[in-house]
Amino acid sequence: MFFISKLSLSNIHVRLTAKGLLRNLQLLSGCKLAVGFLAVDKNKSRTNSKNPQPPTNGQPDLVPPESKSRNVEYYKAQCEKKNQTIRQLENTLLSNNRRFEAVAVVIKHLYAEHDEVMKQRRDLSQELVTLREELVSSGHSCERLEQEKEDLRSAFDGVLQKVQEQHRLDLADLEERLKTFYSTEWEKVHQAYQEEADKCKAQMEQQLEEIRSKHEALKKELESSHIEEVDGLKQQFEESFKGFKQSHEKEMQNLNETLKESEETLSNQIQDLMTENDSLKEKLNAEVKRRMELAEKTQDSHTLYLEQELESLKVVLDIKNKQIHEQDKKLMQIDKLMERNVKLDECLKKLQQENEDLKARMDRHAALSRQLSTEQAVLQESLQKESKVNKRLSMENEELLWKLHNGDLNSPRKISPSPSLNLQSPRTSGMFSSPPVSPR
């Protein structure tokens, strides 16, 4: 239907374009006729203007020359206008001819498309007929296949019933064979497991005895070495403490003696300086009195007095400077003694700290001995626990074997009926052998 409607629309379009072309041709023919008439009139006017007729009846021309010139100009203007219209018409004619040629080309193209569409329509109608024939044949084949399917289903149901009956018989036979096979295997495995359990029990008891003996020997060795170390540390501490104490006492005595000697020397020096100072003061007073007397005697010699006074002051300053230097030296010696005393105090503090460190080491050794005793108790408890765990594991292994036997009897379909099963021997399997107990 879509192709038919498309073809009808194309036909209508072709008809409309053809009608338009006919109208254009009619207009063009009318324009050509009008142009022909105008050209004929123009030629006639030109011939008339070129060949003027003689006056009829032999009468002279009564029109003045001015009116003749005006008529000529008027005709010239008319001719120019007609020429312009003719040119315009020629241009329109050329454009219309071009349009006509284009429309003719379009019409040819449309006719070619129309022919192609008609060919496609014929091909599609032929394909539709073939598809209908194929649909009819496929319907017949589908009915035939449905019939064959029903026949095969009935045959399959019969075969399935036979196979199910055969499978039930095979399962019953397999269950009986498995019961007999696993009963014999269970007896073999149980006997081997019992032998392996007895061996493991004997090995465990032997290992426990060896571990206990080793532990006792190690405990005795540790206790003896610990006691020896503690005694040696005590002796070293006492000897070092005595030596430090004696050296400290000697140094304190020496320091006290040096302090006493320095104090005595300093006190003697101070007394000597005091006596010297008193004697110098007395000398200075005597000198001042003497100079006062001399000044009274010789008031005119004031400059001499001043010079003598300056010299005496210089002597006194030199003496005072010497005394100050000596006192500085003594103070430096006292500072050195004080620093030495401070160093000795620091040595004493270090010795006391070392004494405390030795006491702390002794405490740590005592704590270590207590820790070793507690660890020994913990090891004994762990050995007891491991023996209990081994017993519990043996019980669990027996229970698992019993469950395995009962489970195999209850579900025989999951196991193949082949008698050559790859069963591990209980001596090589890791399920029946318990690992050796290692001390922590």
Curated annotation (Swiss-Prot):
Residues 44-67, 407-440 are annotated as: Disordered. Gene3D superfamilies: Apolipoprotein (1.20.120.20). Keywords: Cell cycle, Cell membrane, Coiled coil, Golgi apparatus, Membrane, Mitochondrion, Nucleus. GO terms for cellular component: Golgi apparatus; mitochondrion; nucleus; plasma membrane. GO terms for molecular function: microtubule binding. It is found in: Mitochondrion; Golgi apparatus; Cell membrane; Nucleus. It comes from the Eukaryota. InterPro entries: MTUS1/CCDC69. Residues 417-432 have a biased composition (Polar residues). Residues 69-401 form a coiled coil. Homodimer. May inhibit cell proliferation. Belongs to the MTUS1 family. This is Microtubule-associated tumor suppressor 1 homolog A. It comes from Danio rerio (Zebrafish).
